[in-house]
């Protein structure tokens, strides 16, 4: 696939067979609409997902030779430690643990990994259990208790290696004393619907937890800690990435401010309000602890690989950024308008351009009548519909793919959506109302009817969102 002769954005015929991809329904997505452009954006987001493979990152950034474990510019002499224990939870944790066990073998003395994905094979040295996401379940509570118990057994002379990644807050959830688990579950659900960013949500979760905010590290008193993680937050702040085992930089006052900002202070339970008003909600000090954190994958690195893919396809990459945040419908509408204007009028971007972003975060603020049902969808799917709606308003030839890198957008079984400038007219023919779907946060249902949901299944990684937008020459009115 190329961007056409001399990179003009004129389209070449589509190959008969879809490119090799981790997207499971590529044929469906290429069965309608602007097939050539769709193939380009699907190839590019696939390149981004491949670049976000945590196992490959461990192979590249963690070395083990002659008893020395090297990571993050540090040497850890495993011959001098009493035990090596691996603890983790999150969407990318199993992939990290698998690669690490392959590297260290029986030098790992035990551990526990909590995941939400089906376990295809057991690890030899580390137990793997499943729990629930995005709202914690009783399995999440039990997993968190076990992580806490294992950490408490460690002390001076032990090496604790962690693999906490995005999703750990729900998969391993242990409320502080005095806060019922049901109240913590409701807190998670309220925050997910609020439109708050990951950073804001975590500022609350960390102060209503018995293990987050560095509390798990405090339980492993005296142990040396090596954190291996991937970034799913804007700015790659380590106390948001693996906040169980690093020093927390947020405050209880920030948590309370977040709840008030989104109108949730009066919605959370009295026990949570009482806890946040107490000194127990402040995170422990970890000064003097030997803690090393290695960010294996971040959005900027993924974007670089996507750029390489775009060039290989004969198009011109333009990086929008790795720290884009905003409401999904607003972002999608803006990008759809921008792409359509560029296609039809050659400004601000010329045809033959692919716009890229990875590591940012689209959010959805759920607005509904009391008691009304929530639609089926997620931020990337809502963004895709808003893009399609905006792109249809001018004589444009554009396509976009919007994917949550973990394979589950908004907790659904779809990773995102792939649309183009013919999507909105086709939706009208099929009696699918894009305006209603966006207003009712029912983007998943609409995209499913259109055959435009992207399905990957659990990817084993989590670097937030990956977006690609291809701009070809349109018909200037």
Task: List each language-model region with its residue ranges.
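Accessory alpha-helical/coil subdomains and C-terminal extensions
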Residues: 220-226, 247-334
